[in-house]
Structures are given as structure tokens and as C-alpha cells.
């Protein structure tokens, strides 16, 4: 099931959950999450592909390949923290790959993602949906939709990213 221009429902849901519930798996994710992911993807595409010409395409990876719990996490999972926003269907962890002119895909460092998303105009687009971004792990960035009107996240960007080693 297509959620946005570039994301399918299966990217936000573990395969086992989708197999059981199919398109009803939308029950398990916050409606704002695909929208936030699409905003981030569009902004990264605009900043990394169009002006530079260094990349000819961009892929934002949530679930898929060896990743199955980067979106919604079932209550019984041992992945992450017990009260993680993932368990409420309000978070994704993602990596970004850029396709070079020679056809090879390469990982775009989390610090580069942090730099782009920290641009005030990008953050304004995300702020309307109460977004938190962090990257306190290696090689990926966290995006969630928790409601925090009195925190620093409601006033501007709060992004931390640590590049993969």
C-alpha cells in the first residue's frame, strides 16, 4: 500500500505484522510519520541530487534488506527501549543512500543529513507535525512524531547524528 510518493506501508511495519494484518497495518503507525518521512526525503533529494550532480538518485531506507524493526516495533521485541516511540508507531530510523553517476550506491553520512535538516526552512516544514530527530547511534538517523510543545524541539531543530564507523 502506497503511503506517500516514495514510501509504502511495508517500509514502516515489520514483515510479520504486515503478513498478519495487510493494509490494516496502518492501525499501528501515526498518520504523520509517512508525511514527515516524505518531507525529509524530498528535502534531501533537493539538496543532494539537484544542485550537486554528485548523485543521480537517492534512496531513504527504513525497513527492508536486513532491517525489519526500524519503524513500528511490536511490544514483545527486544530491540530498543521499552517506551521507545517506535512501539507507539511514531518513529523511524533511516539511512540514506546516494546513487553516483557510475551507478554505485554509497551511504550518505548522518552528519550530512543533520546539516541539511537543520536548515531553518526545512525544519519549519517538519515543525508543524511536532518532529524530533536524533542520531545517537551509528550510521542512521531517528525521526519521531512525539508531541512536545514545551520542549526545545518545538522551537527549532534538535538533531544529533553520529556517522557509521
Locations of regions flagged by a protein language model:
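Extended, low-complexity, intrinsically disordered C-terminal regulatory tails
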Residues: 32-80
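Feature targets compositionally biased, intrinsically disordered low-complexity regions
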Residues: 21, 35, 52, 63, ...
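Catalytic cores and adjacent binding grooves of peptidoglycan-active enzymes
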Residues: 82-92, 96-165
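Extracytoplasmic cell-surface/polysaccharide-interacting catalytic and binding patches
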Residues: 1-52, 146-165
